[in-house]
Amino acid sequence: MNIETTRMIIRDFTPEDAADLHEILGDDETMENCEPAYNFEKTKEFLTSFCIGQKGAVAAVHKESNKVIGYILFNDVDEGVYEMGWIYNRSFWRQGYAYESCKAVIDYAFTELNAHKVFAEAIDTMKSVSLMHKLGMQLEGI
């Protein structure tokens, strides 16, 4: 995947992204509603096995700094059905980067991959739910 927006590039992860990804996954506050923060070795293992090996996620790169500031889970779970999720570097929260890059991935799913459904699950506070609504997602299920 390679998508460019005004301020972001969404692309596949590379091994060189380990330090930037660790700034995200190694931060206690960022990870508080997911799982315990990763040490650097666990970040590298996750990057290699899941992000690169299984192509289970894409990198959200800040154009101006060329820094990976976000991790976007993007998996096909059934024909035409994609799961997505996101975690962003805390230094870049509340500046519209998550919306801009996630919107681009959703648009890509519907226009290029002929998706008929893209969904996300929220386990944290209202931050993710608010973004989901802004992205046009609707509450479904319990």
Predicted features along the sequence, with ranges:
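Conserved GNAT-fold acetyl-CoA-binding loop/helix
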Residues: 29-49
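A short helix-loop-beta-strand connector motif used in the catalytic cores of GNAT acetyltransferases and
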Residues: 48-61, 68-70
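Short amphipathic alpha-helical patches
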Residues: 44-49, 54, 74, 132-133
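Acyl-donor (CoA/ACP) binding surface of acyl/acetyltransferases
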Residues: 1-33, 61-142
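Juxtamembrane/interface motifs at transmembrane-helix termini
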Residues: 40-44, 52-53, 89-91, 121
